[in-house]
């Protein structure tokens, strides 16, 4: 009995200390997030001024939700919808908005559902690709347009692929940046050990609570690690840029909602089933030094496309529209000018 007592007492003390430290750590993270989120409105106006072009923030109703959306450019211009990825927000496109407006486009940049200031419905099922694509369809229609040029990066690119396949009537042209076409992604996950290793985080994101607390404990440090560690040019993100991204992470219920995109994808195979050829003119831009998505994901795509152009940007990491904005913008605008 004494032997068990000698074991149980230190074990109980250690377990109690661990529980206390865990609770303190979680509570500290919640306080950090609350402090950041409290300044959101003022920060949004500061971010809008960074665009150096007339733009407004508004909430647009789609499918029973409200999407916080940045709108700029002439009312009668062709519509361009820019879709951010994980863990970004509308501000990820800050370096593309002005060039597109100056080229005559009506530019619409939503925080997608679950992100930043947009609504965050509870439940993993609310983040399936079908729902995410339906948001974009309704957004285009609510603005009085029948179709749009759709530009997507990362998970925004996955929504763009799904939109072009299942709602082709609303997509005039398609531009995707560092988001694998689903058939290529499935092929590489099955046959390429290097890509499986790079995709480890997708499995980690299936865990409950842990990813939220890891990213949310110190949102500014999380933003710094996420955006600068997969960037060749460390000057691509200023301290202000990281503060905007961190504030998006800190919004109430945002982290769970953002991670639910990955959880929904793992529970349903909609992204990898019912694949259809894409008829619209398509530009796929790829950063050569993306640490999480290998260049082999751009190989063997021709059978799935009627009109595909692939443009690779050397010495560039995953956040290409931030790291190489001049080349991205030149290639984007040149593609849009093509008949």
Predicted feature locations:
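Catalytic histidine-centered segment of alpha/beta-hydrolase-like enzymes
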Residues: 316-329
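Flexible "cap/lid" subdomain of the alpha/beta-hydrolase fold that forms the substrate-access gate
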Residues: 2-9, 20-58, 64-67, 79, ...
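Alpha-helical and His/Cys-centered functional microenvironments
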Residues: 88, 100, 157, 322-325
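Conserved HGGG/HGGXW glycine-rich cap/lid loop of the alpha/beta-hydrolase fold
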Residues: 71-117
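A short, glycine- and basic residue-enriched loop/turn
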Residues: 89-90, 158, 316-317
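Short hydrophobic "strand-cap" motifs at the C-terminus of beta-strands
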Residues: 83, 313-316
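Hydrophobic membrane-insertion alpha-helices, especially the h-region
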Residues: 14-18
